[in-house]
């Protein structure tokens, strides 16, 4: 199987040099694929090779960005824009960190110790780990958990029986956006390639991490909006907590309901809002430091952490669950890197976000040293009275921006999960013609809305919601540390001792926080686990069902002899038929059912397999791998390759145009000259006689002899997901008038 246009492919092997040109597709099939097929070059004297011109269609203007060198001004502008997209969650954490601390009879030693913990947690976790280290592990500019995973799979051949399937092909390493493997693999790389259990463990870690991030999409809006709205209680004794909860729930419902309109119309306000927010909290922080306790910045010395734990012991350790909230949203620096670039995110964090947060927390600590009784309302109590209402408005707007960032991130995660085949197909709508990353998933939106409102109403704004949020945050941090350690050894070729030191150092920090938070599981910390288990159950049920389906089709593929009989018994009619299948080799069983029910086959048969690679995007010239299926004329195999950021569909005629162009090239170059030209002409005219799509509508049924857990997953969970999520016809945007679904029952 060769990619079209590959100089090392069948064209060279056949001794017939073929020069590919990309041209603008016309409306006439015959002109596009036949009339311009061969141009005489050099007056037909035979001195120059024939020149073939093919159109690959408009559908594959892939959404990748060419490598670009950014000027200082461009980097600064991107950094400014990142304030509203990347730093909403991290920036609004001063609303709830100190108020989440429960420390009776706190004094200056306690507040200096907590401030020192916050400063060093922000420095070591956000600045050093994420801004300086994790941001380097991008997949050609794309960040996030899936980017780390795809980067690993580009360097490690996952051959085990893992939930997310990928059969590596030799052509993969030649892709533009596929990282090159080093010639001498490390021992860790060899271990991973030969250990299916290790591969499964890494895959499960990635899936858990993504499910935790989806849970953040429900927890962040709840805690951010509640914390912002609660400030109104400090100015009116008539407003009770139940009123705050109702108002917060209304704001959250409205926030989720407007998602269908997209964020493009209001996203231009996000960065100004967050810039105003950071300037405000920094200014108020400086005011509180000067007015209440100027020496508060001495907390930068870590010995105050020792004094804090020496005094409070277990009670002090229990408050780590509140301190960890200061880095909520730090993972967004990596997850949203694809929208900006590494330098802009680093500049924004180091020049605006980090200093503002340090000043804000220091100001609150200075205020609390003089007013320890205001701990539960630390943020709003520390705001000077004349600025209260302006800050209330800015805080509420900033909380909405923070919520929007995590909600949008949840949609992106779901989209990538669907592309990798580890989540059921849901509706994914693009809400912006300009920004490809702005998508909307209606089903996920309403699930998150219900969960978010239930959390808000259930916890009533108590400390439990902070504990739940903290558990989700620290788990994501731990999973990222684990994956980064593997990346350091396998991809960066870092010395094992240095990579091990990184792992042990951050495991010690995050593990300490984890031990504190796990004691809070019965008191609200169970919520992120419940959300994760729910989404993970969907993910694993779907991938297990798809795996069993592929195994069944591979075992029951149509053999060469049987296929020859099917062709001989079937009438061949003009036109082209595309069979969509998960099989990358062999004739799928759907052909058997189709021929038995129709008694005919088109003159051009194309078995199409959609293949998602562990790369962010696949270039247009790398899209198709095509080859003849067996020795029969008019039967071909096409593998359509996509990255996890590409959109897979067959809308309009563009997919067929591109596929036919690739088939014409292979037919003309690989076969003998006479028959090759005849076959190429047949392929070129087939679409004009009609194009049809055949797709399976399969039902898996597991026999009673199998163990009941697997039977429950297949017969109940997987079947439920099949019935209630989108079908392949809707996902691929097939023309219903040209599509035939073949129903089949697979007994496994």
Curated annotation (Swiss-Prot):
Name the segments for region: Disordered: 30-51
Which keywords accompany this UniProt record? Ion transport, Membrane, Potassium, Potassium transport, Transmembrane, Transmembrane helix, Transport
Q: What is the lineage of its organism?
A: Eukaryota, Viridiplantae, Streptophyta, Embryophyta, Tracheophyta
Which Pfam families does the entry mention?
Answer: K_trans, K_trans_C
Instruction: Name the residues that span the membrane.
Output: 69-91, 114-134, 200-220, 244-264, 266-286, 320-340, 349-369, 382-402, 439-459, 471-491, 498-518, 524-544
Protein origin, superkingdom: Eukaryota
Task: Give residue ranges on the Extracellular side.
Answer: 92-113, 221-243, 287-319, 370-381, 460-470, 519-523
Q: Which residues lie on this side of the membrane: Cytoplasmic?
A: 1-68, 135-199, 265, 341-348, 403-438, 492-497, 545-748
Q: Which GO annotations describe the biological process of this protein? A: potassium ion transport
**Molecular function (Gene Ontology), one example:** potassium ion transmembrane transporter activity
Question: What sections of the sequence does the record tag as coiled-coil?
Answer: none
Q: What is this protein called?
A: Potassium transporter 6
The Gene Ontology CC terms held by the record are: membrane
Function per UniProt: High-affinity potassium transporter.
The places in or outside the cell where this protein is found are: Membrane
> Does the keyword Transport feature in the UniProt annotation?
yes
| UniProt topology in membrane | Multi-pass membrane protein
Family (UniProt):
Belongs to the HAK/KUP transporter (TC 2.A.72.3) family.
């Amino acid at each position: 199987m060769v990619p079209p246009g590959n100089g090392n492919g069948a064209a060279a092997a056949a001794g017939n040099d073929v020069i590919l040109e990309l041209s603008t597709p016309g409306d006439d099939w015959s002109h596009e694929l036949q009339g311009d097929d061969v141009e005489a070059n050099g007056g037909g004297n035979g001195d120059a090779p024939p020149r073939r011109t093919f159109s690959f269609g408009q559908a594959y203007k892939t959404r990748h960005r060419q490598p670009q060198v950014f000027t200082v001004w461009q980097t600064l502008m991107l950094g400014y824009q990142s304030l509203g997209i990347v730093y909403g969650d991290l920036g609004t954490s001063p609303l709830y960190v100190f108020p989440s601390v429960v420390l009776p009879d706190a004094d200056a030693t306690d507040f200096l110790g907590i401030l020192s913990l916050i400063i060093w947690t922000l420095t070591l976790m956000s600045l050093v780990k994420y801004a300086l280290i994790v941001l380097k592990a991008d997949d050609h500019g794309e960040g996030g958990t899936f980017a780390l995973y795809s980067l690993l799979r580009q360097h490690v051949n996952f051959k085990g029986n893992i939930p997310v399937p990928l059969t590596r092909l030799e052509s993969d390493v030649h892709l533009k956006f596929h990282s090159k493997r080093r010639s001498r693999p490390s021992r860790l790389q060899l271990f991973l390639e030969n250990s299916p259990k290790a591969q499964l463990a890494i895959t499960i870690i990635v899936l858990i991490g993504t499910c935790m991030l989806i849970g953040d999409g429900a927890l962040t809006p709840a805690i951010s909006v509640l914390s912002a709205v609660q400030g109104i209680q400090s100015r009116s004794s008539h407003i009770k907590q139940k009123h705050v909860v109702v108002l917060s729930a209304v704001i959250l419902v409205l926030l989720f309901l407007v998602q269908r309109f997209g964020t493009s119309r209001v996203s231009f306000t996000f960065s100004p809002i967050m810039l105003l927010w950071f300037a405000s909290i920094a200014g108020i922080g400086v005011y509180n430091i000067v007015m209440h306790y100027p020496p508060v910045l001495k907390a930068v010395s870590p010995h105050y952490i020792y004094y804090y734990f020496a005094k409070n012991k277990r009670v002090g350790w229990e408050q780590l669950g509140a301190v960890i909230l200061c880095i909520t949203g730090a993972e967004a620096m990596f997850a949203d890197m694809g929208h900006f670039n590494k330098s802009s995110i680093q500049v924004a964090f180091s020049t605006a976000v980090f200093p503002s947060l340090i000043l804000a927390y220091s100001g609150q600590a200075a205020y609390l040293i003089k007013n320890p009784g205001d701990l539960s309302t630390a943020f709003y109590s520390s705001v000077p009275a004349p600025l209260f209402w302006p800050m209330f408005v800015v805080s509420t707007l900033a909380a909405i921006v923070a919520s929007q960032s995590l909600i949008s991130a949840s949609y992106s995660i779901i989209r990538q999960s669907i592309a990798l085949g580890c989540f059921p197909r849901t509706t994914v709508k693009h809400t912006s013609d300009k920004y490809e990353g702005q998508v909307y998933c209606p089903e996920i939106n309403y699930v998150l809305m219900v969960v978010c409102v239930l959390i808000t109403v259930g916890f009533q704004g108590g400390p439990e919601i902070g504990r739940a949020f903290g558990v989700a945050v620290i788990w994501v941090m731990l999973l990222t540390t684990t994956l980064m350690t593997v990346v350091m050894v396998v991809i960066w070729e870092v010395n094992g001792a240095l990579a091990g030191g990184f792992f042990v150092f951050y495991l010690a920090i995050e593990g300490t926080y984890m031990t504190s938070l796990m004691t809070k599981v019965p008191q609200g910390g169970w919520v992120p686990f419940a959300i994760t288990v729910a989404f993970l159950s969907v993910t694993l049920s779907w991938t297990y069902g798809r795996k069993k389906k592929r195994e069944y089709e591979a075992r029951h593929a149509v053999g060469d002899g049987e296929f020859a009989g099917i062709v001989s018994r079937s009438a061949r009619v003009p036109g082209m038929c595309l069979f969509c299948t998960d099989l990358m080799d062999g004739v799928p069983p759907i052909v058997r059912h189709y021929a038995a029910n129709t008694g005919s086959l088109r003159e051009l048969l194309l078995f199409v397999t959609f293949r998602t690679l562990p790369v962010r995007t696949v270039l247009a010239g790398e899209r198709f791998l095509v080859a003849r299926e067996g020795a029969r004329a008019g039967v071909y195999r096409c593998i359509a390759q996509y990255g996890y950021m590409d959109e897979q569909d067959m809308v309009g005629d563009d997919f067929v145009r591109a596929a036919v162009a690739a088939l014409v090239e292979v037919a003309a170059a690989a076969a003998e000259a006479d028959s090759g030209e005849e076959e190429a002409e047949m392929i070129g005219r087939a679409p004009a006689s009609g194009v049809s799509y055949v797709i399976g509508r399969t039902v898996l049924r597991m026999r009673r002899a199998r163990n009941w857990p697997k039977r429950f997953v297949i017969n109940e969970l997987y079947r439920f997901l099949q019935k209630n999520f989108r079908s392949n016809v809707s996902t691929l945007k097939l023309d219903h008038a040209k599509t035939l679904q073949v129903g089949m029952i697979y007994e496994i």
